Amino acid sequence: MRSTYLFTSESVSEGHPDKVSDQISDAIVDLFIGKDPEARVACETLTTTERVILAGEIRGQGIMDTDGNWAPGIEDEIEAAVRQTVKEIGYEQDGFHWETLTFENHLHGQSAHIAQGVDASGNKDEGAGDQGIMFGFACDETPDLMPAPIDYSHKILHRLATDRKNGNAPFLEPDSKSQVTLRYENGKPVACTAVVVSTQHGAGYDEGEKEAELRAYVKRVVADILPDGFLSDATKWHINPTGTFVIGGPDGDAGLTGRKIIVDTYGGAAPHGGGAFSGKDPTKVDRSAAYITRYLAKNVVAAGLATRCTIQIAYAIGVSQPLSLYVDTHGTGTVDDAAIEEAILDIEKLGGLTPRAIRTHLGLNKPIYRVSAAYGHFGRTAEGDRFPWERTDLVEDLKAALA
């Protein structure tokens, strides 16, 4: 790695059309898992002008019977969950309003051929829901053990949303994007060279005093989020660089579930296996294995075993045991990477890295997913049942295994 370089990451807000779709999909996951912790869910959402469409495959007790008939009242609950999600995001606009939008539900039963490969039976453990590779990452650039550019990009937009909802920035609307460029020296972020923030706004905030008010507000937020000394007179600012941004959200661009996988993870600072998270129950290793590898990488860094850690894991559909586990500390490790791999596999309280073991250890069979669907799945605060993959409760086990 070069000693001096620039690196950029972006985030998008909860009101971005793709994130609206992600949150709706995860609201459906939460609804179904709340009824049946073993529910199988693959829910895709399309959002566009005054319309939300669901499609995908589901299975679960109290949700749909084996003949594909919905349980009484469940279709109304699905629609209510969709509208409530859009309402909480804040869309009450002519082109997209939680109360007046048209809703279509095309969810149907899960394929029996997929189910037979995934379900546990007899002496066979539950298999992975699909083949694939998943990555986890952690580094010591921020207190959250996340790459700094994506961490700051998320926090900027989260602050905008908080201020919009509590009335401190009533001129803001839900759709926004951020992008932060940092200069690194000797592998550490030391300065911000550029900030891009595009935020949907009320009428009139694209010129004159109102535009100046919006720009000044955004600069205050960014200055509050970034570490002292990162901003300077040399920092380039691009705030609503295209001008007017009144039409936004699904009315401005169609949204789809699973199109912001780099925003959801590490902002391009680490590899990605390609699988999206939202709309998937935790038997899908695209989701659960990405969570466990983040958890493991974060605990490696938190234990002081490395300052950077990438972990890859791979699965085959219908097979419970992972095909491979790979640890790379990028030359920052205090012990051999292979020893860390061995320690992970030997830690008894993990219970292994099968899909069932991951879900059990992290407590993933709970309705905890909608909150993860905006502002990043990683670098969040583990609180109660939420974001269990952000816990650092494996630190002492790793230290003991490698002593």
UniProtKB/Swiss-Prot annotation:
Keyword Repeat annotated: no
Protein family per UniProt: Belongs to the AdoMet synthase family.
Pfam families referenced in this protein's UniProt entry, alphabetically: S-AdoMet_synt_C, S-AdoMet_synt_M, S-AdoMet_synt_N
InterPro entries on file: ADOMET_SYNTHASE_CS, S-AdoMet_synt_C, S-AdoMet_synt_central, S-AdoMet_synt_N, S-AdoMet_synthetase, S-AdoMet_synthetase_sfam
Co-factor requirement: Mg(2+); K(+)
Broad class of where this protein is predominantly found: cytoplasm
Principal EC category: transferase
Name of this chain's protein: S-adenosylmethionine synthase
Binding site for Mg(2+): D18
Cofactor note as given: Binds 2 divalent ions per subunit. Binds 1 potassium ion per subunit.
UniProt pathway: Amino-acid biosynthesis; S-adenosyl-L-methionine biosynthesis; S-adenosyl-L-methionine from L-methionine: step 1/1
Binding-site positions, K(+): E44
E.C. number: 2.5.1.6
GO cellular component: cytoplasm
One BP annotation, GO: S-adenosylmethionine biosynthetic process
Binding site for ATP: H16, D175, S176, K177, D253, R259, K260, A276, K280
PROSITE patterns linked to this entry: ADOMET_SYNTHASE_1, ADOMET_SYNTHASE_2
